[in-house]
């Protein structure tokens, strides 16, 4: 039993010795240089080093050089490899410095290229200026369109207001249109004759004489037309006066200033009608009666009111 127990303890000790981890490896200058070169290559500052092998962890050694008895060989190998690693580390530092200088130079050249790629900044500024100019032009066009709309609206209102004035002007100038047209025709004929012929003196006098004669004839014709119109108007007025003789009061000296209407105004030659009940003469305008629609029986408003009041009392 004791032998079995001792064997079991020996096996446990062997397992523990095998499973015990070695001391944690410490970073060296070579590892730092490799790490820096890897970072620079990853950032595209330096070209990637394909000729170098993968980064393999080298055997490390404690700085004191003391360790367990079972690990003596490992420590011895690490101490033997220290001197070449330091030499290689100094060369790697030199290469890192050169790579950093190259990277800075490349960086500055790239920045210069970015700053001036065939006048890109000038092109951008020109594009911005053209964009702002197009915006200003569009704003100016909008303002012009608004002004044109306002002017069109104002002209429409002016046309609507001036249409009435044009109609009135046409009515006013319709009487003198014949004279002006005839006078213009005579002037044009006289000018054409005077320009076509050589003897200007006698012919101008003749043309002026003709113009005067024609103007006089036209005036006489117009006077005759006006007289005919006045005669027609007087005849029509006479007919109306004849039709109104039964309605109107006789126009004597006393009856002209006679006041019989409720409005308190005199007769003054205006047409009147007599009430069939109270025999009071009332102006047709006060009774609101047209000359064309004169009734045979007329009752003034006072007689109408008295009738209505009597009917109400009876009811």
UniProtKB/Swiss-Prot annotation:
Residues 54-66, 151-164 have a biased composition (Low complexity). Gene3D superfamilies: Zinc/RING finger domain, C3HC4 (zinc finger). PROSITE patterns: ZF_PHD_1 (PS01359). The keyword Metal-binding applies. A zinc finger (PHD-type) spans 258-306. Residues 190-219 have a biased composition (Basic and acidic residues). InterPro entries: Zinc_finger_PHD-type_CS (IPR019786), Znf_FYVE_PHD (IPR011011), Znf_PHD (IPR001965), Znf_PHD-finger (IPR019787), Znf_RING/FYVE/PHD (IPR013083). CDD domains: PHD_PHF23. GO terms for molecular function: zinc ion binding. GO terms for cellular component: cytoplasm; nucleus. It is found in: Nucleus; Cytoplasm. Residues 51-89, 135-238 are annotated as: Disordered. Residues 78-89 have a biased composition (Polar residues). It comes from the Eukaryota. Acts as a negative regulator of autophagy. The PHD-type zinc-finger domain is required for negative regulation of autophagy. This is PHD finger protein 23B. It comes from Danio rerio (Zebrafish). The gene is phf23b.
